[in-house]
């Protein structure tokens, strides 16, 4: 028998966790001062007057490093639950995880060969 009251705690958590950020934005909007002076409109750079233009174009190299980092960070997130239940899953899960890591290593070698990891 499927009973919906089993999910009451889930819905309560979902509503509360959605309401907290909305309330935080509403309260900060109501309580914050609206006056905009010259100091508030100026750009801030570590307590020093900014030198040059505030809008700089970043090289694509930074994005490639960030992309490779995100890929391997997500790999860690996927492999952690597998590592915690390694003894229960057996050989087939080990082979699947091995193939997953092998594909990621091949991707890293490809990015390395293409020069995506070169800093200069």
From Swiss-Prot:
Subcellular location: Plastid, Chloroplast thylakoid membrane
GO biological process: photosynthesis, light reaction
Reactions listed under catalytic activity: a plastoquinone + NADH + (n+1) H(+)(in) = a plastoquinol + NAD(+) + n H(+)(out); a plastoquinone + NADPH + (n+1) H(+)(in) = a plastoquinol + NADP(+) + n H(+)(out)
Key words, A-Z: Chloroplast, Membrane, NAD, NADP, Plastid, Plastoquinone, Quinone, Thylakoid, Translocase, Transmembrane, Transmembrane helix, Transport
GO cellular component: chloroplast thylakoid membrane; NADH dehydrogenase complex
Cross-referenced InterPro entries: NAD(P)H_OxRDtase_bac/plastid (IPR023043), NADH_UbQ/plastoQ_OxRdtase_su3 (IPR000440), NDAH_ubi_oxred_su3_sf (IPR038430)
Ranges annotated as spanning the membrane: 9-29, 64-84, 88-108
The keyword Thylakoid belongs to this UniProt entry's keyword annotation: yes
EC number: 7.1.1.-
Highest rank taxon of the organism: Eukaryota
Membrane topology: Multi-pass membrane protein
One MF annotation (Gene Ontology) recorded for this entry: quinone binding
HAMAP family, per database record: NDH1_NuoA (MF_01394)
Function: NDH shuttles electrons from NAD(P)H:plastoquinone, via FMN and iron-sulfur (Fe-S) centers, to quinones in the photosynthetic chain and possibly in a chloroplast respiratory chain. The immediate electron acceptor for the enzyme in this species is believed to be plastoquinone. Couples the redox reaction to proton translocation, and thus conserves the redox energy in a proton gradient.
Subunit structure: NDH is composed of at least 16 different subunits, 5 of which are encoded in the nucleus.
Homology family: Belongs to the complex I subunit 3 family.
UniProt-recorded name of the protein: NAD(P)H-quinone oxidoreductase subunit 3, chloroplastic
Organism placement in taxonomy: Eukaryota, Viridiplantae, Streptophyta, Embryophyta, Tracheophyta
């Amino acid at each position: 028998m499927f009973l919906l009251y089993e999910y009451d705690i889930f819905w309560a958590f979902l509503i509360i966790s959605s309401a907290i950020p909305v309330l935080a934005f509403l309260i900060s909007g109501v309580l914050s001062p609206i006056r905009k002076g010259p100091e508030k409109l100026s750009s801030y750079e570590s307590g020093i007057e900014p030198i040059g233009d505030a809008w700089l174009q970043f090289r694509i190299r930074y994005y490639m490093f960030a992309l490779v980092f995100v890929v391997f960070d997500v790999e860690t997130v996927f492999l952690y639950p597998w590592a915690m239940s390694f003894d229960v899953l057996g050989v087939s899960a080990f082979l699947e995880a091995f193939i997953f890591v092998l594909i990621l290593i091949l991707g890293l070698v490809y990015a390395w060969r293409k020069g995506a990891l070169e800093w200069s």
